[in-house]
């Protein structure tokens, strides 16, 4: 059985009198893709930022690869990958220059051009982030997050704002990263995204985890409670039609 790489115990976050995260607990195994699902305001991002050491923990503990995040935040940041927003990158540097900069900051040995090839951006090596499309920016931010060969890769709403083609292209990229054995923790409010990418999901609402299991087991439990779909289930969706008509090749 794979070892636990991330253990979250009774995690809480308060902003004044408002309790955004209310006693969240879960564990993630090495090589697992773990998804945190929930509507806006459920506490997903606050939970992720506390785990990453980017936000103070009000109560509870987070242990990542044997390190207590509250006590060793600097050490934790060296072994994780965090997907940055496009605005976080130096605007006047090219993609390959940015990756070299991040590599040197980490003291890593990664090859910037190989990282760009991994995310299908090698032809954009000399471009600046501002010249990229939305899908390309998201893929580059993942390349930057992989520069230190992280123990855990964190993706916060990685496909928000992308069209169906770019979203599915990013899913393909995450699946490629997953196939290499990288542990991934992601947040999303796209149910299909979680179903495609995640080994297990935790469903959050109002700061609490209200259910946690594999996508298949969660669906089986719902059916076991007598659930009847409100509409006929068909083998294709309108999104499938859109992608079929507009092209399945990589488009940004």
Positions of predicted regions on the chain:
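Conserved ABC ATPase signature
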Residues: 128-132
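Catalytic Walker B motif of ABC-type/P-loop ATPase nucleotide-binding domains
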Residues: 153-156
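Conserved ABC ATPase "signature" region
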Residues: 100, 104, 109-124
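ABC ATPase "signature
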Residues: 212-213
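Helix-to-loop junction immediately C-terminal to a conserved catalytic motif
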Residues: 52
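Conserved ABC transporter NBD signature motif
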Residues: 60-68, 75-76
